[in-house]
Amino acid sequence: MEAVIYSNGNQECERAKILLEKLNFQISVYKLNQHFSQKGFIAEFGEEAEYPQVNVGFKHVGGLKETLKYMSDKGMFL
């Protein structure tokens, strides 16, 4: 399964990456000011969005907490 992380390089972004790697996701990390701008991030996810933002497949899951809940609900932590 594939996942995309929109990252600004903070600890939660790194935690999301480690978590997804441990669950054998193929990960693409898009980095602020390298792959997208803050303005583009806000346009895509809204002004209240925090880093990281995670997409699993074609589904936008949300931040790290939402990603953990999504994975738990899908039984990925068994």
Question: What are the functions of these language-model segments?
Answer:
Residues S7, L32, F58:
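Conserved residues at beta->alpha junctions
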Residues M1-S28:
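Local sequence-structure signature of Cys/Sec-based thiol-disulfide redox active-site neighborhoods
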Residues K31-E48:
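Thioredoxin-like thiol-disulfide oxidoreductase module
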Residues V56-L78:
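Non-catalytic, surface beta->alpha helical segment in thiol-disulfide oxidoreductase systems
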Residues L23, E44-F45, K74:
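Residues at alpha-helix termini
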Residues E14, I18, K39, K69:
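Alpha-helical elements of the RecA-like P-loop NTPase motor core of helicases
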Residues F45-N55, L64-K65:
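Structural micro-motif
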Residues Q11, F36, G62:
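Short alpha-helical
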